[in-house]
Amino acid sequence: VLSPADKTNVKAAWDKVGGNAGEYGAEALERMFLSFPTTKTYFPHFDLAHGSPQVKGHGKKVGDALTNAVSHIDDLPGALSALSDLHAYKLRVDPVNFKLLSHCLLVTLANHLPSDFTPAVHASLDKFLASVSTVLTSKYR
């Protein structure tokens, strides 16, 4: 459960992300594909090369979804319901992949926002991404 302090930290960090959410999403996807090659199996139709339009496009979707989640931090299930349906019923993404992408997102944010990525912000973002992952996998059960 996200505390009021966690919510404040997440919103402040995401304000720093600003218009870079799509770029950071794409970078996190590239990190995930390089660090966890089995995740590539969900994207057989993508050119997974650095900077490819498909990875950039999906990175923008990831960034937009997270921006939406931050905006609706008090109602993540409502905000992410359609995305949860898509990943559970149509795409059938293995739930572990959300944890892998979350880790890569944290690394990406730490790399781009080093002075803002304090231990408290790190913990809050980790809890937030875990909450998002939980919502996205909630319909698998």
From Swiss-Prot:
Residues recorded with modification N6-acetyllysine: 16
Binding site for heme b: 87
Source organism (scientific name): Cynopterus sphinx (Indian short-nosed fruit bat)
Record PROSITE patterns: GLOBIN
Modified residues (Phosphothreonine): 8, 108, 134, 137
Keyword Plastid: no
Pfam families the record matches: Globin (PF00042)
GO terms, molecular function: haptoglobin binding; heme binding; iron ion binding; organic acid binding; oxygen binding; oxygen carrier activity; peroxidase activity
Modified residues (Phosphoserine): 3, 35, 102, 124, 131, 138
Lineage per the UniProt record: Eukaryota, Metazoa, Chordata, Craniata, Vertebrata
The name this protein goes by in its record: Hemoglobin subunit alpha
PANTHER family linked to this entry: HEMOGLOBIN FAMILY MEMBER, HEMOGLOBIN SUBUNIT ALPHA
Family membership: Belongs to the globin family.
Modified residues (N6-succinyllysine): 7, 11, 16, 40
Assembly mode: Heterotetramer of two alpha chains and two beta chains.
Phosphotyrosine carried by residues: 24
Gene from which the chain derives: HBA
GO cellular component: blood microparticle; haptoglobin-hemoglobin complex; hemoglobin complex
Record GO biological process: hydrogen peroxide catabolic process
Residue span, Globin domain: 1-141
Functional note: Involved in oxygen transport from the lung to the various peripheral tissues.
Tissue expression as described in the entry: Red blood cells.
Alphabetical keyword list: Acetylation, Heme, Iron, Metal-binding, Oxygen transport, Phosphoprotein, Transport
Binding-site residues for O2, renumbered to this chain: 58
